[in-house]
């Protein structure tokens, strides 16, 4: 197997899924979605959507041969807000931006020194930016703290995105104030119909790209597990749940990944994946934080 952190790093500029390596297999580049769901990528690859609008199965490689596995599309890093609104400045003090030269994923501050994000957002070097609203402007409220430890869930699966959760230990504690503070972990699982708040600096378009400078918010309900599984047959595990609208139009998107889904003041979800952004019958899929509360607490205790 060869993936973004293995023997072909030049092919993978950002977080991605593992691929089987074969002669002539090249990394796909983002292209336009064509009729029938196919997409044309780099090196002559014909691509078909698999998960998240980020990962595609290659039908043939650069030499015209059958590709051996899945190709992770470099998506400039990760997931999205479509159909939302600009958040009130510093109204979500738990929201963080993960930066590696530029913003690439979101996260949530759960204690003075720990952040929850998505495992597929993993990079070896991450700067956590707290107190942000406009990520292109220094507004005077920010705290930039490097990651001291980056810990993916031990059972994270890059192919299925199961257990898509990661902890980041800050090199020094955040200074808690009105603009930087923590969000509580869940005490009960997310109930269908509950209104939640999703936030991030991700793409605001279902087709094309428009990345905002200011933090975007989206109010959306938790869907039933039956609705979630019907939207993605065979792909929803017990660690995943769906939030959004089956009619489409509102969703998280690229570069929102790792960010928070907050319901009744508790961190219930982590932005994980979806098929496209804000497509009909393709709601966003989120990591169910409730399932990982014990792992989070045990990991923090073991790395304090």
Curated annotation (Swiss-Prot):
Q: List the catalytic residues.
A: 120, 164, 257
Means of activity regulation = Not inhibited by Kunitz-type trypsin inhibitors.
Cofactor(s) demanded: Ca(2+)
Which species is listed as the source? Homo sapiens
CDD domains xrefs: Tryp_SPc (cd00190)
Q: What is its EC number?
A: 3.4.21.4
Across the pH scale, how does activity change? Optimum pH is 8.5.
Give the positions of the site Required for specificity: 251
UniProt binding sites for Ca(2+): 132, 134, 137, 139, 142
Q: PTM Sulfotyrosine: at which residues? A: 211
Q: What name does this protein carry?
A: Trypsin-3
Q: Which family does it belong to?
A: Belongs to the peptidase S1 family.
One GO cellular component assignment for this chain's record is: tertiary granule lumen
From the UniProt record, give one GO term of the biological process aspect: zymogen activation
> Where does this polypeptide localize?
Secreted
Which Gene Ontology molecular-function terms are recorded?
A: calcium ion binding; serine-type endopeptidase activity; serine-type peptidase activity
């Amino acid at each position: 197997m060869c993936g973004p952190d293995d023997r072909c790093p030049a092919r993978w500029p950002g977080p991605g899924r593992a691929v089987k390596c074969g002669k002539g297999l090249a990394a796909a580049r983002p292209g336009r979605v064509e009729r029938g769901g196919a997409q044309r990528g780099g090196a002559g690859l014909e691509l078909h959507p698999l998960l998240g609008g980020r990962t595609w199965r290659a039908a043939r490689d650069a030499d015209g041969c059958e590709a051996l596995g899945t190709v992770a599309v470099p998506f400039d890093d990760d997931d999205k807000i479509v159909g939302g609104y600009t958040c009130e400045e510093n109204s979500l003090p738990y929201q963080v931006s993960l930066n590696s030269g530029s913003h690439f994923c979101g996260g949530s501050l759960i204690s003075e020194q720990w952040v929850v994000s998505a495992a597929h957002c993993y990079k070896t070097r991450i700067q956590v930016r707290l107190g942000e609203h406009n990520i292109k402007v220094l507004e005077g409220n920010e705290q930039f703290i490097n990651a001291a430890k980056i810990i993916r869930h031990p059972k994270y699966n890059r192919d299925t995105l199961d257990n898509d959760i990661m902890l980041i230990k800050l090199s020094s504690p955040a200074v808690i104030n009105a603009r930087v503070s923590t969000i509580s972990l869940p005490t009960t699982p997310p109930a269908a119909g509950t209104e939640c708040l999703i936030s991030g600096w991700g793409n605001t378009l279902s087709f094309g790209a428009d990345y905002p400078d200011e933090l975007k918010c989206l109010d959306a309900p938790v869907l039933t597990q039956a609705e979630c599984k019907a939207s993605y047959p065979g792909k929803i595990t017990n660690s995943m749940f769906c939030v959004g609208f089956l009619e489409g139009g509102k969703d998280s998107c690229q570069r929102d990944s790792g960010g928070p889904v907050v319901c009744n003041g508790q961190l219930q979800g982590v932005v994980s994946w979806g098929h496209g952004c804000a497509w009909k019958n393709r709601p966003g899929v989120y990591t169910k934080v409730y399932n990982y509360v014990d792992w989070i607490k045990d990991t923090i205790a073991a790395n304090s």
